[in-house]
C-alpha cells in the first residue's frame, strides 16, 4: 500500500480575494510607474515579472495565422493567438511529441515485443502515470486508474455503485449538467429498472441566480438523503465555472448513507484536489482540458481505498484481472485490487503517451503554485471586465455590457470565467475568432474564457479585452 497523499493544510483551499488581487495590481503598478490598471503596458510588466512565465515555453502555443478562421487583414498571422480555450482543449506540451515518437519508433522496431520490453512496456504503460495522476487528484496510487474515456468511466462506476432499492433509488446532480453525464445517468436509471421521472433529481439554483448555493445543496441532501442512492455532481460546473465544495457535499451525503461521486472533467489539473482526504467514494475525469493530453485522450477514475478489496459487481474485462496471473488465461477471475479492478481493456499506448508527456510538465511545477497564479490571472480578467464592461462602471465606453456568472469567491472557481453578454453572441463570437481569439461559446449569450495557469499570461488577457472592445463597437454599429 502506498503512502497517503499530503493532507490539505486548511479547509478552504484558496485564500485569495478580489481585494488581494487589487492590492497586487496596485503594488505592481507602483513598481512599474504605470498609474492606470487597465493600461496594456501593465500587462506586459506583470507577464515579465511572473515567476512561472517560463512554463509557457514548455507548450506549443498557436500563432494567429494557424487558426482556421483568423482574418489576416485583422490580425498579424505571425503574432501569438489569444488562446483562452483550455477549458475545452488544452495546448500540446512539447514533451508529448517526443514521448509519442519514442513509442512509434518502438512499434516500428519491436512490434509485439513492445508489450513487455523497453523503458515503458505497453502492457504496463498506464501504471507509469499513476503516481503523477494521483498527485493531481490527491489520491494513493491504488485509488486511481488511467483508463477509458470520461463517459465510459461514468458508466463503469455507476454500474457498480448504483444499486437502487424501493426506498433509496434517486441520483442527485446539478441542473444543466454536461449532456453526456445527464444521458449516462438517465440510461443507468433505466437499466436498473427505474424511471427517470422518479429517480433523477436535478437541483436548480434559486430563482434569479445562476449558480447553486452550497447551503442549498447541503440542505437538500439533509432533508431528502434517505431517498438518495448517489450524489453525483461536477467538481467544476462546465457552463458556469462554479467549483463545488466537494468535501462538504461528501460529508453531507455520507451522513445520510449516500454514495458520493464527482465528474472532475473541469477540475482535473485545474485546481488542487484531495479526493482521499475528502473521503469521496468515486470520481472520474477526462484529461484533455487542463491535463493537456489531446482531443478525446484517455480518462481516469478514482475509487477510495476503503473499497480496495471490495467484491461488488462491476463491468469486467481481462484488465480487471491481476497482472500476475492475467496471461494464464484459465478464465477464473483473479480480481485486481482497488481502482485497478475497474479497468476493462488494455491501455492505448498513444493516448497514455500523451499523458506521460503532460505529466512531465506537472513534474516541474506544483498544482498549488499554479492555482495561486490562476487566481491572479482570473482576478485580473475579472477586474478588466468589470471596469471596462460592467453595467454600472463609469469607465465603460460601449453600450455592450458584460456580467460574470462564475462565482466571485475564488474558492468557488478555477481557471474559467463565464461571461454573460447584454447582446446575443451571434455577431460577437465570429468577430472574436476573426481576430485570433480562441474562446468557447454557449448560446444565447455566454462566452467561456479560461486563462490557463500553465501557459496563459496577463498579456493574453489584456489583448483579449482590447479585441473585445473593438468587437463591441462593431456590435453597436450593427
UniProtKB/Swiss-Prot annotation:
Residues involved in pyridoxal 5'-phosphate binding: 150-151, 178-181, 234, 263, 266, 288, 318, 346
Cofactor: pyridoxal 5'-phosphate
Gene Ontology MF terms: kynureninase activity; pyridoxal phosphate binding
General function of this protein: Catalyzes the cleavage of L-kynurenine (L-Kyn) and L-3-hydroxykynurenine (L-3OHKyn) into anthranilic acid (AA) and 3-hydroxyanthranilic acid (3-OHAA), respectively.
Main location: cytoplasm
Protein name: Kynureninase
Protein's UniProt keywords contain Hydrolase: yes
Protein EC: 3.7.1.3
Keywords tagged on the record: Cytoplasm, Hydrolase, Pyridine nucleotide biosynthesis, Pyridoxal phosphate
Organism whose genome encodes this protein: Caenorhabditis elegans
Encoding gene (name): kynu-1
Pfam families reported for this sequence: KYNU_C
Amino acid at each position: 500500500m502506498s503512502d497517503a497523499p499530503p493532507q490539505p493544510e486548511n479547509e478552504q483551499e484558496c485564500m485569495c480575494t478580489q481585494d488581494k488581487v487589487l492590492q497586487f495590481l496596485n503594488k505592481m503598478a507602483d513598481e512599474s510607474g504605470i498609474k492606470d490598471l487597465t493600461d496594456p503596458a501593465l500587462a506586459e510588466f506583470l507577464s515579465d515579472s511572473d515567476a512561472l512565465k517560463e512554463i509557457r515555453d514548455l507548450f506549443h502555443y498557436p500563432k494567429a495565422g494557424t487558426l482556421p478562421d483568423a482574418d489576416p487583414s485583422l490580425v498579424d498571422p505571425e503574432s501569438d493567438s489569444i488562446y483562452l480555450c483550455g477549458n475545452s482543449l488544452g495546448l500540446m506540451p512539447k514533451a508529448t511529441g517526443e514521448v509519442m515518437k519514442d513509442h512509434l519508433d518502438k512499434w516500428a522496431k519491436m512490434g509485439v515485443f513492445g508489450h513487455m520490453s523497453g523503458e515503458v512496456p505497453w502492457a504496463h504503460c498506464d501504471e507509469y502515470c499513476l503516481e503523477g495522476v494521483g498527485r493531481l487528484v490527491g489520491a494513493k496510487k491504488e485509488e486511481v486508474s488511467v483508463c477509458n474515456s470520461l463517459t465510459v468511466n461514468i458508466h463503469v462506476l455507476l454500474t457498480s455503485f448504483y444499486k437502487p432499492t424501493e426506498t433509496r433509488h434517486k441520483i442527485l446532480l446539478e441542473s444543466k449538467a454536461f449532456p453526456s453525464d445527464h444521458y449516462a445517468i438517465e440510461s443507468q436509471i433505466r437499466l436498473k429498472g427505474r424511471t427517470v421521472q422518479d429517480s433523477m433529481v436535478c437541483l436548480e439554483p434559486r430563482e434569479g441566480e445562476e449558480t447553486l448555493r452550497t447551503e442549498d445543496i447541503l440542505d437538500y441532501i439533509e432533508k431528502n438523503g434517505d431517498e438518495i442512492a448517489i450524489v453525483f455532481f461536477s467538481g467544476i460546473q462546465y457552463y458556469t465555472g462554479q467549483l463545488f465544495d466537494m468535501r462538504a457535499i461528501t460529508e453531507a451525503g455520507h451522513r445520510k448513507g449516500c454514495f458520493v461521486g464527482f465528474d472532475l472533467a473541469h477540475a482535473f489539473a485545474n485546481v488542487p484536489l484531495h479526493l482521499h482526504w475528502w473521503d469521496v467514494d468515486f470520481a472520474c475525469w477526462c484529461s484533455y482540458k487542463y491535463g493537456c493530453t489531446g482531443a478525446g485522450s484517455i480518462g481516469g477514475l478514482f475509487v477510495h481505498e476503503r473499497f480496495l478489496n471490495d467484491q461488488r459487481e462491476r463491468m469486467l474485462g481481462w484488465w480487471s484481472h491481476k497482472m500476475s496471473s492475467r496471461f494464464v488465461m484459465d478464465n477464473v477471475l483473479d480480481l485486481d485490487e482497488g481502482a485497478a479492478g475497474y479497468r476493462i481493456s488494455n491501455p492505448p499506448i498513444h493516448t497514455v503517451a500523451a499523458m506521460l508527456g503532460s505529466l512531465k510538465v506537472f513534474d516541474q511545477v506544483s498544482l498549488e503554485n499554479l492555482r495561486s497564479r490562476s487566481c491572479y490571472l482570473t482576478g485580473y480578467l475579472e477586474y478588466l471586465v468589470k471596469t471596462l464592461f460592467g453595467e454600472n462602471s463609469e469607465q465603460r465606453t460601449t453600450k455592450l455590457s458584460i456580467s460574470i456568472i462564475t462565482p466571485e469567491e475564488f474558492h468557488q472557481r478555477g481557471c474559467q470565467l463565464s461571461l454573460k453578454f447584454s447582446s446575443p453572441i451571434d455577431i460577437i463570437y465570429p468577430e472574436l475568432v476573426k481576430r485570433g481569439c480562441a474562446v468557447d461559446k454557449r448560446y444565447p449569450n455566454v462566452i467561456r474564457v479560461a486563462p490557463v495557469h500553465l501557459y496563459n499570461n496577463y498579456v493574453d488577457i489584456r489583448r483579449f479585452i482590447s479585441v473585445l472592445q473593438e468587437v463591441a463597437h462593431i456590435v453597436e454599429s450593427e
